[in-house]
């Protein structure tokens, strides 16, 4: 019995001596029992080496994809004529110089949008300086009748009135004249808006910035 105990003790000491120094050091998400098992500034959290939230290190999270600008992510998809389009309930935050895409819209009866403008249930003359805003910016109609200031990359600016929503949630139907859902960063302007900015509406889409006037 004494010989067996001596043999087991000898085996245990041999195993310890064979373990190289630092063999237990783990990197991100490696196994650990305490912070001594983790490399550098990492600490042991729930049996895995990870960043120390109190220190604020980002060693393990450094490769995590950054969130989309403005934190606005697609809420779903719609398929129009075999092509999928993202839908949105939100738009990027409005600032004193909000980046956007200017598109052209026909606000007259039978025009691009199908139905009358959301704000007043009326059709409009395209000689008016008017716009439709993406769903998030339209904000349930809270910007109806308000003026926004649009600035083109050529330096020209124009004030235009919000009369409609560029629907980012729905599309591909009769109500939307078969068009896909609007992107979440659209200012859909009348011919008069494009003309005042010195832009060719046939270009289709141009980069602008806008703010509340």
Swiss-Prot record:
Post-translational modifications: Undergoes proteolytic cleavage by actinidin to produce kissper and KiTH. Three forms of KiTH are produced by cleavage at different sites, the main form produced in vivo is KiTH-1.
Keyword Transmembrane attached: no
Pfam family, one: KWL1
UniProt key word Secreted: yes
GO cellular component: extracellular region
Residues recorded as bearing 4-hydroxyproline in the entry: 65, 67
Region: Disordered, residue numbers: 91-121
Coiled coil: none
Signal peptide: 1-24
Listed Polar residues bias regions: 93-107
Disulfide pattern: 28-60, 32-44, 38-49, 72-90, 80-172, 119-144, 166-172
Compartments in which it is found: Secreted
Keyword vocabulary terms for this entry: Allergen, Disulfide bond, Hydroxylation, Secreted, Signal
Family: Belongs to the kiwellin family.
Protein name: Kiwellin
């Amino acid at each position: 019995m004494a010989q067996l105990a001596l043999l087991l003790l000898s085996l245990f000491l041999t195993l310890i001596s064979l373990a190289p120094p630092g063999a237990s050091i783990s990197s991100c998400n490696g196994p650990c029992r305490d912070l001594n098992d983790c490399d550098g500034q990492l600490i042991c959290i729930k049996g895995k080496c990870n960043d120390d939230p109190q220190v604020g290190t980002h060693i393990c999270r450094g490769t995590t994809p950054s969130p989309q600008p403005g934190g606005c992510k697609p809420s779903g998809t719609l398929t129009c004529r075999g092509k999928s389009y993202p839908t949105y309930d939100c738009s990027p935050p409005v600032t004193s110089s909000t980046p956007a895409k200017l598109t052209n819209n026909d606000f007259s009866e039978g025009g691009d949008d199908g139905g009358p403008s959301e704000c007043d249930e009326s059709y409009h003359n395209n000689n008016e300086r008017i716009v439709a805003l993406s769903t998030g910016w339209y904000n349930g109609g809270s910007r109806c009748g308000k003026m926004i200031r649009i600035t083109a990359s050529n330096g020209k600016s124009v004030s235009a009135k919000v009369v409609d929503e560029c629907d980012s949630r729905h599309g591909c139907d009769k109500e939307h004249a078969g068009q896909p859902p609007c992107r979440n960063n659209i200012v859909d302007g009348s011919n008069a808006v494009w003309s005042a900015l010195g832009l060719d509406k046939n270009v289709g889409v141009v980069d602008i910035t806008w703010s509340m006037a």
